[in-house]
Amino acid sequence: HTKASHANSTLATDGERLIAFFGSEGLYAYDLKGKLLWQKDLGVLDAGWFTDPSAQWETGSSPILHDNVVVIQADVQKGSFLAAFDARTGKELWRVSRSDVPTWGTPTVHQVNGQTQLVVNGWRHIGAYDFKTGKEIWKLTGGGDIPVPTPVVHDGLIFITSAHGPKAPVYAIRETATGDITLADGATSNAGVAWSAARDGGYMCTPPVYRGLVYIVKYNGVLSVYDAKTGEVKFQQRLAGGTSAFTSSPIAADGKVFLASEDGRVYVLKAGPTFEVLAENDMTESVLST
């Protein structure tokens, strides 16, 4: 892919070691002076687009590191899996199969009533897993067919979005969900899903949740802001006049939300339920990273 490389994944560190994931080239651990501690060959991880396997986009999911455990989400053409490794030795602790095509999201670690969970995005297989064993806790089908954004947790809800193909959903999932929580046709909520929106999902950007609002920006620059608890739409506004794509995820701090377009324009908005631009800054170069 023209926007990809052989090093799409972000490094993970716990202050003692660096974990790097290079898809088919393997999983690596280094100390902070660059000494190789261990490496794992995970085989061929074919992350080509499922409708055109010859389109080699490379893997994009980043490793996560928690409590001396490294977790990898490897959704590929054949044999998709989620796996955990001992960060000190590289020993595989568990591996579970996933019924999904290539996806590019990174898992999130979350504590629910004393249980550590892994939450993953997907198309056919969005879900949560027990961090210690890999046992599935809940699952959900019905994402966009090229999932990229990372799940975000806020105030008892897990926000998952994706966009591409016929669906572009936003889900607010209760952290206590169990079992199959896939929505029935025409439904927007159930016992596991607090609320959802069918067509406002983000393609590339992970949405921040800030001061009770969810900020979801589409690839074409349309920003949708939701009440995190109720799903009420506060406003929708197009940024960049529709002339630039958005790949970089928004960030929020100090009462402001920062959104960077691919053409290098950074939009600074006042955080809140109404649209107000505080500043625009030109980086004079393309911006795709967060």
Where are these regions (language model features)?
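Noncatalytic, solvent-exposed loop/strand surfaces
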Residues: 1-290
